[in-house]
Amino acid sequence: MSTEASVSYAALILADAEQEITSEKLLAITKAAGANVDQVWADVFAKAVEGKNLKELLFSFAAAAPASGAAAGSASGAAAGGEAAAEEAAEEEAAEESDDDMGFGLFD
């Protein structure tokens, strides 16, 4: 497991336990899990999440995901209806552009 993932999971564990996220606690959890994490990574992650509520952050992304999926679904439905019209327009253009002799042949 990567260092970043190890420290991220440790931060999530602390957030779930409603504990303050500090570099010492992050190092303790990663060490208990058998991950070798440098002090600098624990410091960086502790500073990054300082004063932030990770649970709230995660739930805000989780709540936004279905809304974007619904929008994509309606857009694909509209695209399917427009696709048939686009195919008809392409067929009309192909009919207009026939291989009539326009005087541009190389071997006339």
Curated annotation (Swiss-Prot):
<dbReference type="GO" id="GO:0030295">
    <property type="term" value="F:protein kinase activator activity"/>
</dbReference>
<comment type="similarity">
    <text>Belongs to the eukaryotic ribosomal protein P1/P2 family.</text>
</comment>
<feature type="region of interest" description="Disordered">
    <location>
        <begin position="72"/>
        <end position="108"/>
    </location>
</feature>
<protein>
    <recommendedName>
        <fullName>Large ribosomal subunit protein P1B</fullName>
    </recommendedName>
</protein>
<keyword id="KW-0689">Ribosomal protein</keyword>
<keyword id="KW-0597">Phosphoprotein</keyword>
<dbReference type="GO" id="GO:0002181">
    <property type="term" value="P:cytoplasmic translation"/>
</dbReference>
<feature type="compositionally biased region" description="Low complexity">
    <location>
        <begin position="72"/>
        <end position="84"/>
    </location>
</feature>
<dbReference type="GO" id="GO:0051260">
    <property type="term" value="P:protein homooligomerization"/>
</dbReference>
<dbReference type="GO" id="GO:0043021">
    <property type="term" value="F:ribonucleoprotein complex binding"/>
</dbReference>
<comment type="function">
    <text>Plays an important role in the elongation step of protein synthesis.</text>
</comment>
<feature type="compositionally biased region" description="Acidic residues">
    <location>
        <begin position="85"/>
        <end position="102"/>
    </location>
</feature>
<dbReference type="InterPro" id="IPR038716">
    <property type="entry name" value="P1/P2_N_sf"/>
</dbReference>
<dbReference type="Pfam" id="PF00428">
    <property type="entry name" value="Ribosomal_60s"/>
</dbReference>
<dbReference type="InterPro" id="IPR027534">
    <property type="entry name" value="Ribosomal_P1/P2"/>
</dbReference>
<dbReference type="GO" id="GO:0022625">
    <property type="term" value="C:cytosolic large ribosomal subunit"/>
</dbReference>
<dbReference type="GO" id="GO:0042802">
    <property type="term" value="F:identical protein binding"/>
</dbReference>
<dbReference type="GO" id="GO:0006414">
    <property type="term" value="P:translational elongation"/>
</dbReference>
<keyword id="KW-0687">Ribonucleoprotein</keyword>
<dbReference type="GO" id="GO:0003735">
    <property type="term" value="F:structural constituent of ribosome"/>
</dbReference>
<comment type="subunit">
    <text>P1 and P2 exist as dimers at the large ribosomal subunit.</text>
</comment>
<dbReference type="GO" id="GO:0051291">
    <property type="term" value="P:protein heterooligomerization"/>
</dbReference>
